């Protein structure tokens, strides 16, 4: 569950959020991809260490050298599957539109599926892939449409500004209280206010991101939570990444943690553990 969730914050695709960031922030794809590399590395490094030490505590072992698949043979059979990803990233990096990049990636998937001698798709498989893709597209479209209503309500009624005002006001109060007990050398009101706002915004993003698909998640967070951080002087790209990350973490954060429930169902384990 944690690993698959990390895939949504890892370049180059980032669960389709990278395409939306291009539109919202108006910056090149390369800048978004580069900004997302180090946080993704930290996420997977922390997860690797947690799994490693948990496995040592439980006495679990990995595959032996004989059981490990041969790298050369595996790469020989699987390397064509990298072609669609290279096409997608290459078109995006060249400054073309996300729509053209998606078209190039899909075309690459079809050609690789039909021509790959080690794992060739049948025409029936291709038909089923189109059918599945259409179903997913409808689901994402419906979610995006519903999110559009939410964004419209937030924008037209001024709810977004009210949320920003509440968070900033509460952050200033908390910062004032913290400044009274922290030594003068550390009592920078602006820093304390931003820290309090980040904590509250992170909590709000986790609560609002529960059970929401990646694309809709990002749209909601950008409309509701990101403006607060921008008002406090955070760079727009940093604010967008922050609210997106915490919105995605809702999938593995109790009490909802839908990804954990799905993983527990496949593993036949207790989701509460």
Q: What is the predicted role of each segment?
A:
Residues 1-30, 47-52, 209-219, 243-265:
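Alpha-helical transmembrane segments and, especially, the helix-loop junctions at the ends
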Residues 4, 23, 39-40, 44, ...:
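Residue-level recognition of pore/gate-forming positions within transmembrane alpha-helices
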Residues 5, 16, 20-24, 86-90, ...:
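Alpha-helical transmembrane segments of multipass membrane proteins
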Residues 33, 82-83, 103, 195-200, ...:
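Hydrophobic alpha-helical transmembrane segments
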Residues 34-136, 260-273:
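Long, contiguous bundles of hydrophobic transmembrane helices that form the permeation core
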Residues 76-82, 134-140, 167-201, 230-238:
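Membrane-interfacial loop-to-helix junctions in multi-pass transporters
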Residues 99, 103, 125-165, 190-207, ...:
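Core transmembrane alpha-helical segments of multi-pass membrane transporters/permeases
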Residues 173-225, 243, 250-253:
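Hydrophobic alpha-helical transmembrane segments of multi-pass integral membrane proteins
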């Amino acid at each position: 569950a944690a690993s698959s969730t990390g895939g949504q914050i890892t370049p180059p695709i980032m669960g389709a959020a990278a395409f939306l960031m291009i539109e919202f922030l108006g910056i090149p794809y390369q800048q978004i991809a580069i900004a997302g590399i180090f946080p993704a590395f930290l996420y997977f490094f922390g997860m690797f260490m947690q799994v490693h030490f948990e496995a040592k505590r439980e006495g679990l072992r990995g595959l032996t050298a004989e059981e490990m698949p041969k790298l050369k043979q595996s790469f020989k059979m699987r390397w064509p599957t990298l072609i669609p990803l290279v096409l997608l990233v290459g078109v995006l990096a060249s400054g073309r539109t996300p729509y053209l990049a998606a078209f190039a990636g899909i075309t690459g998937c079809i050609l690789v599926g039909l021509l790959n001698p080690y794992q060739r798709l049948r025409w029936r498989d291709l038909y089923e892939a189109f059918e599945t893709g259409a179903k997913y597209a409808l689901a994402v479209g419906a979610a995006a449409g519903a999110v559009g209503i939410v964004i419209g309500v937030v924008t037209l009624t001024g709810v977004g500004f009210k949320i920003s005002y509440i968070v900033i006001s509460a952050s200033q109060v908390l910062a004032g209280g913290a400044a009274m007990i922290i030594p003068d050398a550390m009592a920078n009101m602006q820093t304390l206010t931003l820290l309090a706002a980040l904590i509250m915004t992170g909590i709000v993003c986790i609560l609002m991101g529960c059970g929401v698909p990646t694309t809709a998640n990002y749209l909601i967070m950008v409309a509701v939570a990101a403006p607060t951080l921008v008002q406090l002087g955070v760079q727009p790209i940093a604010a967008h990444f922050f609210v997106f990350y915490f919105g995605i973490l809702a999938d593995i954060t109790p009490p909802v943690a839908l990804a954990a429930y799905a993983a527990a169902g496949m593993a036949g384990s207790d989701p509460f553990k």
